Amino acid sequence: MSSWKDSLTSIPGTVAQLINESASNLLHASSTLGSTVGLGGSGSTGSGSEAGGSEESGPQGAEYRALPIPASLVREQWRLIFTSDANIQDLQAAIAHCRDLVLLSEELSEERRWLVRHLVDLRYSLQELEEAQEQHSLSSDMVVMNAIRAVVGHHFVPHHPHHGKRNRLQAAAKRNYCDHCTTIIWSVVQNSYVCSDCGFLVHQKCIDGVKRVCAHVLVSERQHPISEICPEIGLASQGYKCAECGTMLNIKNTWIEPRLCDYSGLYYCPRCNWNDSNFIPARIIHNWDFSPRRVSRTALQEIRLFLNKPLIRLEEDNPKLFVFVEKLCAVKKLRQNLVHMRHYLAACKIASELKLVDQQLGVRRHLAQSNEFYSLSDLSQVESGALSEFLQGVFKAFNDHIRSCPMCLAQAYICEICSNNEVIFPFDDGCIKCDQCNSIFHRVCLTRKNMICPKCIRIQERRLQLDRMKSTEDDDDDDDGVATDDDVTAAE
């Protein structure tokens, strides 16, 4: 039984090998080229043969590892898993079949998760194979060198830290370590690859044994950072094994001691948890605590990918923070003003030509689109005060344009309570906006009216008047259509 399970877990989960080998065949290269990671190995061919012994792939003949295929999909593996002999038609058929299986599988199940990841790999490999056919004019060495290796969601590209004089000096002062074997990467004599999505750095020789799923895949599936503070489940629930590589953990031996990740609440071995420190999103949201805590390597990469994504509804998750944290309250007020300003700038042709919003906000347009969403980087800058300074600079630039632009001034308001000729805007200090009719008044003036908007009163009176007129007309129509007693008597 154990050998049967091992044969299932050894089924690779990527198809980059068939890309490079097919490209080499197209270019009539020698069979010695192609030290690539692929979906070959101990897999099934597209003709329907069952999974057999491991097949050499690369100079070392190493066995490629990936996520184990779910037991319920074993009978479908011959239609999903291919060796390097597969062509574009085989991949297209596998993509169509895998897509159908995704629709038939249950939501949030292990089968659907495996199928979605495998579908991404198939589509990515199909694209690479099509591009390889288009590059038939390139030499085989160039194709193999530029090949992207796909392993458990990672997209590994060659790592070149010595390009440029400045980069060479920086690389000499900084040591890079392999995320798989934890040893130093000597860039002068050793080739290395880096994942273009999550930054996973690895020796070329270690690519075959990578087990960690790409953090970019995990972020795409989870969509939000973990909201619980250190959701620990205990070593017993993990079977006293590392949550990533499955190494048996032992408290007595330091080289295999369990290390707790404060982000995921799981225990890892020293190779998967380097005691890196980082702030924890859940502790920021619930406790406004930015103290660095020890996290695993995969958690560190995941937090970095979440860093600039505006996904946190802070006022919904913890509304009392805006009461106790003055910096947060000030930032909220600035963002509310920027939201009002954006409506003026969106309708201004001059601001559109100047690209004022893009120039001031860049990729952080969410700061002026609403005041609900925050990123981890935003919250960190709120604590340091950098975000408040940034928003004040943006506010000044927007305010200068609106008050000097004739198109924006044409949309200004005048307080109808005090009849002052001074124009006012909803983002001015001392002004307030009616939530019903969007009219702008001086706060002092509206306070004297007991916070009752005069425009809303006029609208309500006009609506009542129209209702009375309509009811009167309906009564007249009824009188014209119904005969009275006098009319009946006269007719007799």
UniProtKB/Swiss-Prot annotation:
Q: Which GO terms describe its molecular function?
A: zinc ion binding
Q: Does the keyword rRNA-binding apply?
A: no
Which keywords appear in this protein's UniProt record, sorted alphabetically? Metal-binding, Repeat, Zinc, Zinc-finger
The organism's superkingdom is given as: Eukaryota
Please give the residue ranges the record annotates as the region Disordered: 38-62, 468-492
- UniProt protein name: Differentially expressed in FDCP 8 homolog
- Where is the secretion signal located? none
Where on this chain are zinc fingers (Phorbol-ester/DAG-type) annotated?
161-214, 400-453
Metal-binding in keyword set: yes
- Show the disulfide pairing: none
Source taxonomy? Eukaryota, Metazoa, Ecdysozoa, Arthropoda, Hexapoda
Ranges annotated as biased composition (Gly residues)? 38-51
Similarity comment: Belongs to the DEF8 family.
Acidic residues bias locations: 473-492
Species source reads: Drosophila melanogaster (Fruit fly)
